[in-house]
């Protein structure tokens, strides 16, 4: 797996902390991972997060690539199968013909690029596909295009259990982050947290590649810290 990280290091431990938070709710089975803009690390995050869940005994995980144009998941994991989501929705292929096994997880590539991704993602067939996978797997992770680029993520967010945002801490503009949350809230998305990439805290004197914040809707859009990292000595 191209996105594999070394065992027992800080990055791997960060993913395990996120996994712990996400497994608190037994009904949190279908999870969208997206970002506000490009190059914030959402695809790397979702690949490693899916792998982290796949490490658990007797847990079935599937990772779905719904970023039809970029196909980031397929590229990162080295999947050459051209068939996937779009082919299933259009009735050209069956589900078991498209699923690929990558280490401990199953992967469903995006397939061919549809003329209208919004129509595909909003279709009854697509929603039924996600529901079918929800019944077959313990966890379903979905990668999508950035929210400020296409409306695709906002569509998917309406029929998954939860949405996780990935933000590059040094690059994300606060106004863009606020706009992203407003877009998701307008469609009734359940924003369950934020993964903050390449996060440095001078206050706690540590550097972390990934920090996780739960989203507290009662605090008017403020992210509250869920996990405290160990300080470097």
Residue ranges and their predicted role:
Residues 132-135, 147-170:
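Inter-motif core of Ras-like GTPase G domains
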Residues 68-70, 94, 112-115, 147-148, ...:
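Conserved nucleotide-binding/hydrolysis micro-motifs of P-loop NTPases
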Residues 2-12, 16, 20-27, 35-40, ...:
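P-loop/Walker-type NTP enzyme "switch/lid" segment
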Residues 53:
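Aromatic pocket-lining residues of Rossmann-like dinucleotide-binding sites
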Residues 32, 107-109, 141, 164-166:
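Structural motif
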Residues 178-233:
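Hydrophobic micro-sites
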Residues 141-142, 196:
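Hydrophobic residues in beta-strands of the RecA-like P-loop NTPase core, especially within AAA+ ATPase
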